[in-house]
Amino acid sequence: MGSEMCIRDRIDEKLEGAKSAGAAHTINVLKEDLEEKIKEYTHGHGATVSIDAVCGNDSLIRLLKATGNAGRVITMGFSTSPTEINQFLITSKELDVRGSRLQNKMFGRAIELINEGKLDLTGSVSHTFPLLKAQEAFDFVGSHDPSIRKVVLTFDF
């Protein structure tokens, strides 16, 4: 039996993109309770692995609640805002909580896979800007436009 991916977000368009990219389930956390939906999708067990790429005010605590016994919770964001954690959730469920910067010496291999056409990033990059318009790109990202997925600077001279 394989794994099923469940994606959470606040923006329906991004959830639709995740669904079309292969996510088994999507949850709009503004409309649905994350913990309840995860329990429903996992027949009451909770998630085996949860990844917090948002690192918002309550995203980690939500994932700790939605992750099942002996599960793993990975944080990937770079928020400097303090987060209150209920240690009982970690200890009672025997959760493994880790931080990841995605720097496990695989970046070169990832580039190779992209160049070989073996890693499909269709839909991942929503906007590109030439390097000379870097400030415009940063301003655009700062606008929090809901259409933004990833913004890439290109080196077209």
Protein language model features and the residues they cover:
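Conserved SAM/SAH-binding beta-strand->alpha-helix loop
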Residues: I11
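C-terminal hydrophobic helical "lid"/dimerization subdomain
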Residues: N57, I61-L64, N104, G108-F157
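Glycine-rich cofactor phosphate-binding loops and adjacent beta1-alpha1 units
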Residues: E16-D96, D156-F157
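Short beta-strand "acidic-cap" motif of Rossmann-like dinucleotide-binding folds
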Residues: I7-R8, T75
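Bulky hydrophobic/aromatic packing residues
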Residues: L15-G17, H25, G46, R101, ...
